[in-house]
């Protein structure tokens, strides 16, 4: 699929679903299902409810998207760090 065939839209994560899926509300109010891109999974970028994200949507199926960027907001909810440090 060529890059010209993808739509880039911003949205807010409403809900974290099982199996690394997310429910995202776009700026225009449309709710879509999304998953994290491979680069985000590889770099262990955590996506939580309330995060502002950028999605890529195919023009052929506007109900599914791929999250390719999580915006850093000062008011974004972050869990406290507890437990063992990562190795």
From Swiss-Prot:
Ranges of residues in domain S1-like: 1-72
Region named Disordered: 68-87
Pro residues compositional bias, start-end: 77-87
One cellular component term from this protein's GO annotations in UniProt: cytosol
Superkingdom of source: Bacteria
Localization per Swiss-Prot or TrEMBL: Cytoplasm
Keyword entries, A-Z: Cytoplasm, Initiation factor, Protein biosynthesis, RNA-binding, rRNA-binding
GO molecular function: ribosome binding; rRNA binding; translation initiation factor activity
Keyword check for Transmembrane: no
Listed Pfam families: eIF-1a
Biological role: One of the essential components for the initiation of protein synthesis. Stabilizes the binding of IF-2 and IF-3 on the 30S subunit to which N-formylmethionyl-tRNA(fMet) subsequently binds. Helps modulate mRNA selection, yielding the 30S pre-initiation complex (PIC). Upon addition of the 50S ribosomal subunit IF-1, IF-2 and IF-3 are released leaving the mature 70S translation initiation complex.
Family affiliation: Belongs to the IF-1 family.
Self-association and partners: Component of the 30S ribosomal translation pre-initiation complex which assembles on the 30S ribosome in the order IF-2 and IF-3, IF-1 and N-formylmethionyl-tRNA(fMet); mRNA recruitment can occur at any time during PIC assembly.
PANTHER family: TRANSLATION INITIATION FACTOR IF-1, CHLOROPLASTIC
Name of this chain's protein: Translation initiation factor IF-1 1
Organism listed in the record: Burkholderia lata (strain ATCC 17760 / DSM 23089 / LMG 22485 / NCIMB 9086 / R18194 / 383)
């Amino acid at each position: 699929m060529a890059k010209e065939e993808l739509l880039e839209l911003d949205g807010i994560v409403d809900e974290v679903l099982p199996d690394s899926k997310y429910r995202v509300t776009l700026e225009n109010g449309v709710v879509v299902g999304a998953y994290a891109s491979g680069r985000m999974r590889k770099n262990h970028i955590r996506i939580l409810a309330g995060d502002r994200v950028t999605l890529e949507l195919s023009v052929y199926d506007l109900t599914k998207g791929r999250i390719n960027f999580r915006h850093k907001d000062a008011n974004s909810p972050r869990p406290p760090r507890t437990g063992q440090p990562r190795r």
